[in-house]
A protein has these predicted regions:
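Beta-strand-rich assembly/attachment modules of structural machines
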Residues: 1-129, 163, 169-182, 244-245, ...
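Acidic, small/polar-enriched beta strand-loop surface segments
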Residues: 1-29, 133-210, 220-223, 233-235, ...
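Envelope-exposed proteins and targeting segments
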Residues: 47-49, 93, 110-112, 450, ...
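Intrinsic-disorder/low-complexity, polar/charged segments enriched in Ser/Thr/Lys/Arg/Asp/Glu/Gln
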Residues: 48-50, 113, 141, 220-224, ...
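Bulky hydrophobic/aromatic "packing anchor" residues in well-ordered structure
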Residues: 51, 195, 240, 334-337, ...
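Charged- and aromatic-enriched interaction segments used to assemble
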Residues: 85-93, 101-202, 210, 214-215, ...
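Secretory/extracellular carbohydrate-interaction modules
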Residues: 216-219, 223, 227-239, 244-246
Length: 646
């Protein structure tokens, strides 16, 4: 059949069979894609794609055992569509195939129309795992976030009131020192590899004065964390260590015969001169996240409680007392690094842990019946947890990290709003991400290259949102400066976008309300409610309500959509293909009577339709009345045109 080639612009369709992309363009009969939303008040929907493939030779028949793709024609295969114009290649769509339906028109013709959805569908199916759980009430001596997305980690004491020295170091000993002063937790280290613990980096918290001004660890303590690994190479791997002469402890992983189990070791030098080892016979290298909780209590000359829990259950086998001890003579803590004890130690953890270690919390007590069982309850799903103080973009990064979303398909702004911590495990990731979008009043969509894209409020006043990326003209405008010609345009002027009473609610019932009596006297009272806004401060609720009221208290002539024939003018094809959701464009209409009408708009959605002889593009658009007011900006510095930002 003919190639999808339009006046110098060519389309390419690739499917990922196995680990490589395969070009199937020669079999494509038609393609249609849809991304974005109809208007700025809608939620960005899951992008979709339909591709019809010639199947007369049964290349795309899952039951054709002689076919080259047999065994790989399965749901959720990656598919991507690109277009090349001139020397530039542009992304159109990337997603995941849902089905391979077989169609037989007659003995001489057969085709497959595959449907695909973008990453929103995958994230909608991804449920937040239980290792989001962390304590909300009890006192924490140390808390290491071990953020997956950047390799950073946080450390702070229970009250955020002490100046505790904290240090990140490389395995070569180089490092930087920061302090945990009063205020929010600090990023005290930055390493692109520490989150994977691949031997290039490890983290170390140094506190030579001890924790809370007493002995390096209490005579009673416990440590909690989540680990995830697929390590099968035999050896002893360091996970966590706090060494001292009196109350030291360590946790490691022993891999033997490809099977990995955990070992907890406890020292009490100066008293019984012994080490107590707990060996939990639960395989932990299955690639799943595992909750670990290790306890220690001394009275001080005898051991009373040393237990190791995995996934909420105490399954340890106590292997007895030994003459070797925890040798480090000063207080420090290492995570994911080798742990050297003594020449006679039963387990010297000589290797770097390879995998993921998350949410390391050191407690100043052992949780049992008299204190509650909080850390063990963290393993149970559904009870929720709190991270107080994350910015919206950072929270999104955690959400994506906990379901192992690829870094190269992630494009997140930092965020401007600080959010509440309430997240319930068991909800899907997409819903949790959209909560952050609402809190920020930003934009969350899947870009044309398949990335999860988050634009915060600050970015809405920069870049493509501010600088016009293209101009559209009707076909009656033919001067040398004309823009992309459009074939159809939809104007609206109705009551759908009139709201003069805005109510914004936090979880728990706190709310802010903004009203405009003048608008209500003209158009009646029209209420819009935004629920479950996860901001941590009431003034942000007020700002959201005021901003939304300014945008929608009065009607406005809108351009909801415009349609372009991509083949009408080959020289404009690159400009069409370059446009993306969130881009600023101008549209000019030449009426039969009067002067030109010019509107500045934001692209909200993009649809492409390709056949062997046609290419039609539809853009959904919204007004720019939600652009912020920016001082000293010739474009965004005009009152009564822009919204005062917050």
């Amino acid at each position: 059949m003919s190639e999808l080639l339009f006046d110098g612009m060519s389309l390419t369709v690739e499917i990922r069979f196995g680990g490589t992309w395969t070009d199937v363009t020669e079999y494509v009969r038609n393609v249609s894609t849809s991304r974005g939303r109809s208007s700025e008040l809608d939620t960005y929907s899951t992008g979709s794609c339909n591709i019809t493939l010639d199947n007369r030779t049964r290349l795309f028949d899952p039951e054709n055992t002689a076919g080259p793709y047999y065994g790989n024609l399965t749901p959720l295969r990656s598919v991507r569509i690109k277009a090349t114009s001139g020397a530039t290649t542009y992304d159109i769509f990337r997603g995941y195939i849902e089905q391979w339906p077989q169609s037989y028109i007659n003995p001489n013709d057969a085709f497959v129309t595959i449907t695909a959805s973008d990453a929103f569908k995958v994230l909608n199916m991804s449920i937040l795992p239980s290792h989001w759980e962390i304590a909300i009430g009890a006192e924490k001596l140390r808390w290491f976030r071990m953020a997956d997305f950047s390799g950073s980690f946080y450390v702070f004491d229970s009250a955020n009131s002490r100046s505790t020295s904290a240090q990140w170091m490389s395995s070569a000993g180089a490092g930087v020192t920061s302090f945990c002063n009063p205020g929010p937790p600090l990023i005290v280290g930055e390493s692109t590899t520490s989150s994977a613990f691949d031997g290039a980096r490890f983290v170390q918290a140094v506190d030579p004065l001890g924790i809370n001004g007493v002995t390096p660890l209490y005579s009673e303590w416990s440590v909690e964390m989540w680990i995830q690994t697929t390590e099968t190479e035999d050896g002893n791997y360091g996970i966590w260590n706090h060494g001292d002469f009196i109350h030291g402890g360590s946790l490691g992983m022993v891999v033997a015969g490809g099977n990995a189990t955990l070992v907890g070791q406890f020292g009490n030098r100066g008293n019984s001169n012994a080490m107590y080892t707990n060996n939990v016979q639960v395989t932990v290298n299955d690639g799943r996240p595992h909750h670990v909780y290790m306890t220690y209590r001394s009275n001080p000359s005898s051991f009373t409680v040393q237990e190791l829990y995995v996934d909420g259950s105490n399954l340890d086998v106590s292997t007895g007392s030994f003459t070797d001890v925890v040798e480090q003579g000063y207080s420090f803590m290492t995570i994911g690094a080798p742990i050297y004890k003594s020449a006679t130690a039963s387990n010297n953890f000589t290797k770097y842990f390879r995998g993921s270690i998350q949410e390391v919390v050191v407690w100043g007590q052992v949780f049992d019946g008299s204190f509650g069982n909080e850390p063990l309850d963290h393993y149970e799903s559904g009870s929720g947890k709190r991270y107080q103080g994350d910015l919206t973009g950072l929270r999104m990064a955690y959400l994506l990290g906990f379901v192992n979303w690829p870094y190269d398909l992630t494009d997140l702004a930092a965020g401007q709003s600080t959010v509440l911590g309430l997240i319930t495990t068991g909800k899907n990731v997409l819903d949790a991400l959209r909560e952050m979008e609402t809190a920020e009043q930003g934009r969350l969509f899947i870009s044309k290259n398949g990335s999860v894209k988050f634009v915060d409020r600050n970015a809405l006043g920069e870049g493509n949102f501010v600088t016009v990326q293209a101009q559209f003209d009707d076909l009656g405008r033919n001067d040398v400066n004309h823009g992309i010609p459009y074939t159809d345009i939809t104007f609206t002027y109705d009551d759908r976008y009139i709201f003069n009473d805005i109510v914004v609610r936090q979880p728990g019932g706190n709310f802010a309300e903004a009203e405009d009596s003048t608008s209500q006297s003209k158009y009646f009272k029209r209420t819009s409610t935004i629920d479950n806004v996860q901001v941590d401060n009431g003034y942000l609720l007020t700002n959201i309500a005021a901003s939304r009221l300014t945008q929608y208290k009065d009607p406005e002539i809108r351009i909801d959509s415009l349609t372009v024939n991509g083949r009408a003018e080959p020289a404009k094809q690159g400009s069409i293909l370059n446009l993306e959701i969130g881009d600023r464009v101008t549209v000019i209409r030449t009426p039969a009577v009067g002067t030109e009408i010019e509107k500045t708009l934001i692209i909200e959605g993009v649809k492409h339709s390709f056949t062997t002889d046609s290419w039609i593009v539809t853009f959904n658009t919204s007004p720019t009345n939600n652009a912020p007011f920016v001082l000293d900006s010739s474009l965004l510095g005009v009152l009564d045109t822009n919204v005062l930002g917050y």
